[in-house]
Swiss-Prot record:
This is Formamidopyrimidine-DNA glycosylase. A zinc finger (FPG-type) spans 255-289. The active site is at 2 (schiff-base intermediate with dna), 3 (proton donor), 61 (proton donor), 279 (proton donor). Belongs to the FPG family. Disulfide bonds: none annotated. Monomer. It comes from Nocardia farcinica (strain IFM 10152). The gene is mutM.
Length: 294
């Protein structure tokens, strides 16, 4: 699943190419792509048609579009947002209407500048759904996102509160980093990269880390995400692309993730791979010593 940098790359593309455009006909060709919209495909299409895209927004790994009604005296806002679930392979592409339709393009929304917003999803784990907006800690977010914490790139991210929340958890620090209700946007790749940069083993208990150590870790989370964002995100296959169909290249700079048995870029020790929460963790045994068993 895309993590914060990859989703932010898509959000920026939508903000540039889709915000301000009026939605025309919406064509839905695969029912799974709208399965989260319980009112059905016809309802989703009808409620989007004729609306102007107001903004593309994000919290953590969650992405949504807001709308208003063009021509209304107060630019009346639609009381729901289009939540975009990218899943494992979802792509939001902006294409000329005359461009060949991609094999797995399950939703196509015509825009008033002659382009189309296309949702392409090979594995069909993702989809679109309209959801009511709710006010949470001073911001309007879709109800399915209401439980998600702010992410390290959010201007209103309160690092000291997050430090306290992390240290209150009696779980492995990597598990806590992946908890989207504590801090959002971090997935397996950037958790491993941030922990390596901070010199912390992911199996250490969060409650046993000092405040300075957690502050350092959060600073590294932010730093690695900004670097990944500048590189267009991490693309391990052709399924992650931006709205123009281009892949990111941050995988070239990864220090530990996916580098089993390769030398640590800092000390030269072979990177190790371990099982963790039905996935893999990568770390340097020398730079990130395992916690001692009591």
């Amino acid at each position: 699943m895309p993590e914060l940098p990859e989703v932010e790359v898509v959000r920026r593309g939508l903000a540039e190419h889709v915000a301000g455009r009026v939605v025309g006909a919406v064509t839905i060709t695969h029912p799974r792509s709208v399965r989260r919209h319980l009112a059905g495909s016809a309802d989703l299409a009808a409620r989007m048609t004729g609306r102007r895209v107001r903004a593309a927004q994000r919290r953590g790994k969650y992405l949504w579009l807001t709308f208003d009604e063009p021509g209304a005296a107060d630019e009346t806002a639609l009381d729901a947002a289009l939540v975009v679930h990218l899943g494992m392979s979802g792509q939001m592409l902006v294409q000329p209407a005359a461009a060949p339709v991609e094999k797995h393009a399950h939703i196509r929304a015509a825009l008033d500048d002659g382009s189309e917003l296309r949702f392409v999803d090979q594995r069909t784990f993702g989809g679109w759904a309209l959801a009511p907006l709710a006010e949470v800690d001073g911001s309007l977010v879709p109800e399915p996102v209401a439980h998600i914490a702010r992410d390290p790139l959010d201007p209103r991210f309160d690092a000291e509160s997050v430090v306290a929340a992390i240290r209150a958890k009696n779980s492995e620090i990597k598990r806590v980093l992946l908890d989207q209700t504590v801090v959002s946007g971090i997935g397996n790749i950037y958790a491993d990269e941030s922990l390596w940069r901070a010199g912390i083993n992911g199996n250490r208990l969060a409650s046993g880390l000092t405040r300075p150590a957690v502050r350092r870790l959060l600073a590294e989370v932010r730093a690695v995400m900004l670097e990944a964002l500048a590189a267009g995100g991490t693309s391990f296959d052709a399924l992650y692309v931006n709205v123009n169909g281009q892949s990111g290249y941050f995988e070239r700079a990864l220090a530990v993730y996916g580098r089993q048995d390769e030398p640590c870029r800092r000390c030269g020790a072979p990177i190790v791979r371990e099982k963790f929460m039905n996935r893999s963790s990568y770390s340097c045994p020398r730079c990130q010593p395992r916690p001692r068993r009591r």
